[in-house]
């Protein structure tokens, strides 16, 4: 998915990364002091040092005591304080013996170490772990970005992005990267990719809203009209939305409003039978506004939650069919008008969406065949050009093959290898 678009982005990243590498300069390493993380770690570090100091003091005290006893006669009256000191020295001496015994048991036979050699290597409370973080910094001006940004714009246009969308993305990347000093690590591609992701995310996130929350809070029945040209997956998208609503516990009735195309009523009827929902229809050639009106009245009478109306495929230049669409919207006011087109149609789909939006304002789009789209132009451009969000992606022929649009997920797909 989006393989050709990924190639174009990859070329830009490579070109700009080279420029950044050439201009990047080393900066002084940052010294990061890592203090102990918790009280437990403090206790673990303090314990060996305290134990070591206590044993050293005990040994020193014993040595001086022995010298004193050898040089002086026995003293008959010993002060209480001295008795306490003697008792303390005895406890420390016992502690030393226990410590040495424990260490001897833990050591392998071929490698004997003293108790002090065992505890000294441990990190003490007064010691700090220091790490050096080496960074580089780079300052980019307009001249540095001139050639890479030109390549980016050409790549976007070749990927079927609308000119205004390409310009918006290029301008965003330029504003993010020029005029400020940025710290970078060893991977210069990260700074470039981050700027690109942010720029594209801004474009595809235009006026997004949650379809599920929106319809949940609308007064029932909710009326949704689907528009677009023939052969783009409009009827299939209606069946997928029907399946989604049924899975959410709603009731649905379909309106066979495409009375212009031969076989359209039968095609929608097949989906209605498979999904187990009612379809309201008239004979071929009937007034589609009357069919859709009857479907809405049926939903009200039977307390149906949703009316999904199919319409004849039409171009905005077909004045009769556009007048028909205006009549449908006037007779049975829709809560949502959804434009359906193929992602693989690229910039053509974007132009059609813009033209429909001018004639009969749409509320959002469904792009079908997104799994077969190598360029990604329509998916990136359509929300920006119309000012109306992408609601769903069609990703296959099954009823479950409908992906709710998530801007961040979509941008990740553009960069995933």
Curated annotation (Swiss-Prot):
Its EC number is 3.6.5.4. It catalyses: GTP + H2O = GDP + phosphate + H(+). CDD domains: FtsY (cd17874). InterPro entries: AAA+_ATPase (IPR003593), P-loop_NTPase (IPR027417), Signal_recog_particl_SRP54_hlx (IPR013822), SR_rcpt_FtsY (IPR004390), SRP/SRP_N (IPR036225), SRP54_GTPase_dom (IPR000897), SRP54_N_sf (IPR042101). Pfam families: SRP54, SRP54_N. Involved in targeting and insertion of nascent membrane proteins into the cytoplasmic membrane. Acts as a receptor for the complex formed by the signal recognition particle (SRP) and the ribosome-nascent chain (RNC). This is Signal recognition particle receptor FtsY. The lineage of its organism: Archaea, Methanobacteriati, Methanobacteriota, Stenosarchaea group, Methanomicrobia.
């Amino acid at each position: 998915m989006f393989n050709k678009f990924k190639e174009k982005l990859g070329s830009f990243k490579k070109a700009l990364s080279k420029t950044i590498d050439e201009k990047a300069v080393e900066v002084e390493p940052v010294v990061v002091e890592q203090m102990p993380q918790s009280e437990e770690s403090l206790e673990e570090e303090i314990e060996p040092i305290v134990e070591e100091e206590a044993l050293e003091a005990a040994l020193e005290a014993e040595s001086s005591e022995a010298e004193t006893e050898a040089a002086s006669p026995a003293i008959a009256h010993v002060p209480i304080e001295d008795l306490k000191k003697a008792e303390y020295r005895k406890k420390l001496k016992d502690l030393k013996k226990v410590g040495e015994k424990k260490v001897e048991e833990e050591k392998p036979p071929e490698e004997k170490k003293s108790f002090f050699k065992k505890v000294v290597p441990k990190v003490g409370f007064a010691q700090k772990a220091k790490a050096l973080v080496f960074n580089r910094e780079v300052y980019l001006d307009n001249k540095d970005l001139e050639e890479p940004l030109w390549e980016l714009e050409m790549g976007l246009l070749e990927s079927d992005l609308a000119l205004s969308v390409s310009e918006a993305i290029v301008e965003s990347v330029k504003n993010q990267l020029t005029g400020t000093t940025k710290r970078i690590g060893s991977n210069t591609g990260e700074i470039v990719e981050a700027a690109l992701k942010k720029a594209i995310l801004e474009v595809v996130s235009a006026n997004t809203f949650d379809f599920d929350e929106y319809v949940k809070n609308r007064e029932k029945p909710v009326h949704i009209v689907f528009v677009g040209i023939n052969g783009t997956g409009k009827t299939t998208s209606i069946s997928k939305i029907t399946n989604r609503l049924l899975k959410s516990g709603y009731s649905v009735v379909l309106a066979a409003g495409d009375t212009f195309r031969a076989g359209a009523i039968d095609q929608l009827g097949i989906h209605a039978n498979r999904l187990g929902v009612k379809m309201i229809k008239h004979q071929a050639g009937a007034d589609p506004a009357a069919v859709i009106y009857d479907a809405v009245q049926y939903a009200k009478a039977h307390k149906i939650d949703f009316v999904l109306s199919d319409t004849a495929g039409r171009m905005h230049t077909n004045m009769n069919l556009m007048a028909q669409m205006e009549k449908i919207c006037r007779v049975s006011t829709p809560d949502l008008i959804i434009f359906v087109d193929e992602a693989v149609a690229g910039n053509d789909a974007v132009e059609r969406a813009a033209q429909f939006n001018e004639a009969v304002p749409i509320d959002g789009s469904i792009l079908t065949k997104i799994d077969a789209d190598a360029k990604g132009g329509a998916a990136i451009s359509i929300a920006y050009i119309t000012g109306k969000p992408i609601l769903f992606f069609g990703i296959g022929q099954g009823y479950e093959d409908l992906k709710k649009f998530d801007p961040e997920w979509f941008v990740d797909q553009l960069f995933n290898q």
